[in-house]
Amino acid sequence: LNVLDLACGSGPLLKILFDHNKNLNLKGIDMCPEELGLAKNLLLNSGVNLIESKAQNLTAIDDNSVDIVLCHWALTLMDPIAPVLDEVRRILTSKGQFAALVDGPMNSAPAYKEVHDLIYSYVQEEMPSYGKIDLGDPRIRGSESLSNLARKAFPEAKVTIETNVVSMEGPVTQVAEIAAGFFYAAFVLKPDKRKSM
């Protein structure tokens, strides 16, 4: 199987895929050379092909050549989004699949808004303007608008949007640290501030 991690960042999903099945033909694309450098170090001797490119311009990948395109929490940040979906459609095989993980609405899970607000309050103490502007196309954040975008880009495909809620158990500090990892905002905090959060 030919699998593409779209906006692969530092490569954690590619590493999981490689460790799980060494027979996959894996590619990762990201626009950030620094992230790709981290991915290269993480994936030493794996044979994973890493490509520097924007998601709106996947010319390094042939038409109808990818069986599965995965996009883990990056589609939300992309704008314009229509060319991204057009490129995904172009590179997918006729039976190919596209799966993207995106943020859901604030009311999608108990305590999600409270965790979000707590993290952002700490970040905004240091950077008052942080979070005032949402990156990416806002249509990605709504189920109906996302469904409409996907149906337009993939008119022949079965489009399904599922709400999945992550559930965690364990010591409070451990759960808090893991939950903070789901928010980009938590990574802009200095280590001491993040620890106090």
Q: Can you describe what each PLM-predicted range is?
A:
Residues 1, 65, 95-96:
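Surface-exposed loop/turn positions
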Residues 2-58:
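Class I SAM-dependent methyltransferase SAM/SAH-binding core
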Residues 68-81:
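A short SAM/SAH-binding and catalytic strip from SAM-dependent methyltransferases
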Residues 82, 97-169:
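Conserved catalytic/acceptor-binding region of the Class I
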Residues 78-79, 92-94:
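Helix-to-beta-strand junctions that scaffold the AdoMet/dcAdoMet cofactor pocket
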